Amino acid sequence: MLLRNISVLLVLLTSGCVGIPRNVTPVTNFKLEKYLGKWYEIARLDHSFERGLTRVTADYSLRKDGGVRVLNRGYSETEAKWKEAEGRAYFVKQPDQGYLKVSFFRPFYGSYVIFELDQEGYQYSLVSGPDKSYLWILARGPEIGDELKKILTEKAATLGFDTDKLIFVTHQ
């Protein structure tokens, strides 16, 4: 009985981490094969696991089990070294919906919600975590134009993200 209660508690504690923020809708007609590859972090809301990092990238590739290998990499200026974190991601619902769960510390998963995406060329995306304290602007290159930056920032602000706190990442 105790083991069952602990199992239920663990499910309840970890299930909240794969939710979708209010008013945020994952993209549909998502094609994983087009999303795979290297993405540059253009901007993010601050979190301890990325604090102080520049030149941040994420590489996505297929895993043998059908999931996605996630390799995040960033440079710590204060430590003068590269930092990497490898994780795995799986679709939460249908594979044509930009809604995945990602883990860097199994068995714990967090949401990866793609809610804005260049549907033709997959050149930029807006991604959130389980709540609105997580936000990333990603692109295929290390920079995006000012107009696109403004459009993406305004879209996130309209949905309730605190875009005044965005950290714009340098890639030099």
Feature-to-residue mapping (PLM):
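Hydrophobic alpha-helical segments and their boundary regions
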Residues: 4-5, 149
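Sec-dependent N-terminal signal peptides
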Residues: 5-14
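A beta-rich soluble binding module of mature secreted/lumenal proteins
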Residues: 17-172
